[in-house]
Amino acid sequence: MASTLAMTPVATERTITRKSRTPEPSPGFAGPGHTAVEVLAARARQTDPFVLLMDDRLDFDPGQVLGGEHPHAGLETVTLMLEGGLDGEAEGLLQTGDLEWMTAGKGVIHGENVRAMGRTRLLQLWIALPRALRHMEPQVELIHLASVPVRREPGAEVRVYSGRSGDLI
């Protein structure tokens, strides 16, 4: 997805202003069976363009419908499936290692009929779009694990979902 947006890299120098420990999981918005950890809290001045990073843990019966319709606008959500999966009629099937990159742009309503595939864990990062791109048409890209390039080095394996690592783009 990042390759479809014409964005100029911007170097921003930052200093560490505070350190914190990641909190314990707390009840999530989807009710019993959902816990979440706010890994990166919304502190726009310190974390811009990153709005929020959540570590969501879902323990629902397979096929159970989750959440419901909800809107996003002016941002991108990047969802990495760490364990399990979700099956969304509109979004498609996300399984372990898959990534969904949704650019909400001028606005999108999504999340209807998303079904759990049993125990699931995912990371979701919210990124503020630059002002010039906040009113673009919404788009969604699913990146399935099998299509993600892998860079192997002694003692390390890097999957490149966006950007580059060494010679991999």
Please name every model-derived segment:
Residues 2-37:
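Hydrophobic alpha-helical membrane-insertion signals
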Residues 26-79, 146-169:
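A short glycine-rich, His/Asp/Glu-containing loop-to-beta-strand
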Residues 70-86, 126-131:
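Short, conserved beta-strand element in jelly-roll/cupin
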Residues 76-96, 105, 109:
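A short beta-strand-loop-beta hairpin characteristic of the jelly-roll/cupin
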Residues 91-98, 114-116, 139-142:
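"Short basic amphipathic alpha-helical interaction patches in structured regions
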Residues 105-133:
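Ligand-binding loop in jelly-roll beta-barrel domains
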Residues 124-131, 144, 160-164:
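Short, structured patches in soluble enzyme cores that scaffold and shape functional sites
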